[in-house]
C-alpha cells in the first residue's frame, strides 16, 4: 500500500491553499500517509493577456493536471469545480466534492460602498461573460472591462487601473482570508442579480477510476448534499455543451431532499437572458429538464451564434 500521496495542483496561491486544505482534511482521517503537492502550470495560467472567452476551448485550467493524473505522475488532483469541463478525460472520475464554500459572486468597490451608489457609466472589471451579461441586464449603463490574474493581482488592479468595482468569487476571497480584511469594500451579489457559475464555491477532487485505494480515501471528505447539487448543475452544463465562451449559469440548492435548480443562458450584452427553474428529488432529471426548457426557448441559437463570433 502506498504511503506517499502525490497531489496535483495549479501553482496559484488560491489553488495551493485549496490543495493544502484538502490534504489537512485527509490527514485527520489518514495520519499514517504523507502528502506532497506537485505544482502544474496550465494553459489558462500561461495565457494572461487574452480573456478566457477568446482563448476558447474547455479545460483551460485542468487539462495538463488531468494528463499528469492519467500518466500516474500524481495520485489525485484538486480543482475549483467551476473550472472542470462537464466531460472528464477517459479513465478519470470526480472522487469527492467537499462541502461547498459560498457560491456567490461579490463586488469589491473602489470608492463607493454598494451597487446602488455606483454612478452611471461605472467601469466594472470582470472577464466572465456570465457576470457581464447578467450585470448589463440590470445596469446597461455599466462599462465592462476585462481583468485577469490571481486575486491579489486583481485587487491591485482595482485601484491601479481605476476600476469603479471588480467582481470576484466570494469563495476565493474566503479561502484566501480576504473576507477578514476590513479595508475592502465588499458586497455580496444575490443570485437573483447574478446567478453563480456551475459548481462555483465547490472543489472537485479528481482521481483515476481504477485507483480504489485513493477512491476509498477521498470518500471520507465527500459532502453528499454538495455533491447532489453540483450533479444537477453539471448535468445542465453538459446538456447545453457550455463553456467559458458562453454566458451560462446554474445553481442548485437542496432542502428536505428536494433539489431546487435555476439555470440561464444569455447573449454577451445581456439583452437576451433565458432562464428556467425546476424542483424535484432527482438531480440529473432536474438539470436535464432546465436545459431542455432553455433549448426549447432558443438557447441553442444563442450558443451557436456566440461560438461563431
Curated annotation (Swiss-Prot):
Cofactor or coenzyme needed: dipyrromethane
Keyword DNA damage (UniProt): no
Residues found modified as S-(dipyrrolylmethanemethyl)cysteine: 244
GO cellular component terms listed in the entry, alphabetical order: cytoplasm
Pathway linked to the protein: Porphyrin-containing compound metabolism; protoporphyrin-IX biosynthesis; coproporphyrinogen-III from 5-aminolevulinate: step 2/4
Enzyme class: transferase
PROSITE patterns listed in its UniProt record: PORPHOBILINOGEN_DEAM
BP term (GO), one: protoporphyrinogen IX biosynthetic process
EC number: 2.5.1.61
Cofactor note: Binds 1 dipyrromethane group covalently.
Keywords of the record: Porphyrin biosynthesis, Transferase
Catalysed transformations (reactions): 4 porphobilinogen + H2O = hydroxymethylbilane + 4 NH4(+)
GO molecular function terms attached to this record: hydroxymethylbilane synthase activity
Additional free-text comment from the UniProt record: The porphobilinogen subunits are added to the dipyrromethane group.
HAMAP family: Porphobil_deam
Family: Belongs to the HMBS family.
Cited function: Tetrapolymerization of the monopyrrole PBG into the hydroxymethylbilane pre-uroporphyrinogen in several discrete steps.
Known partners and oligomeric status: Monomer.
Protein name per its UniProtKB record: Porphobilinogen deaminase
Organism: Listeria monocytogenes serotype 4b (strain CLIP80459)
